[in-house]
Amino acid sequence: PKISLGPELSVGVPALAEPFEAWLTGYDEDIPHRWNLFLPEGFSITGSTVVDGLPGTEEAKSLGKWCRASSCILALRGGESGPALQECLDELKTEGTVLSFGKGPDLPSGFFRLVMEDPAQRGPGVLVKALAAREVITGWPDVFILREAVGSLFLPEDGGEPRVLPLAEPLRVPDGEDERA
């Protein structure tokens, strides 16, 4: 099969739930389960979507074009972030580099969740450059960034915070069946 991965990441940036695309000559619902049996520990296929379109049509657009947004966790290494990071994120939101950011009840103190559009153009490197330009950090060693999701952008009608939705439906694992058993 032809396989391609989602928007690239800078070296050293860990990621969760990264999309990949596989062009197959045939597909059945058991393929993701069978592939999981052979993937290295720490890797698993958690969802799948069949895109059935002729080359060159909107349905068959490249994976990069499906990936409209990313969500990442950001924190400064070595302690609390202080007001400088929050001020910088406010500026990045005002200028449109960051769609939203917040501390979130599920995050430790000093950590922020950010949603950004167009992950192929606005990745972790953009954040590091902006933070360094504003002298919040000196460079990569001063910051922790985890890309937690890449997918479609969901903008709530009620004006709530934007979210990143996965591109694939979760796999269905029959009750009592372990994926790697």
Question: Which functions belong to the PLM regions below?
Answer:
Residues A22-D28, L74-G79, L114-A120:
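Short beta-strand-to-loop capping motifs
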Residues P19, S71, S109-R113:
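A generic structural signal for beta-strand entry/edge sites
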Residues F20, L37-D90:
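Internal, conserved structured core segments that host functional sites
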Residues A15, T25-E41:
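Unchanged
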Residues G6-V11, I31-R34, E58-L63:
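Intrinsically disordered, low-complexity boundary segments flanking structured domains
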Residues G12-L16, K65-C67, L107-P108:
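Short, flexible turn/loop "capping" segments at secondary-structure junctions
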Residues K2-S4, A84-A181:
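Core RNA-modification/binding signature centered on pseudouridine synthases
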Residues P1-T25:
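Short, charge-patterned binding micro-sites
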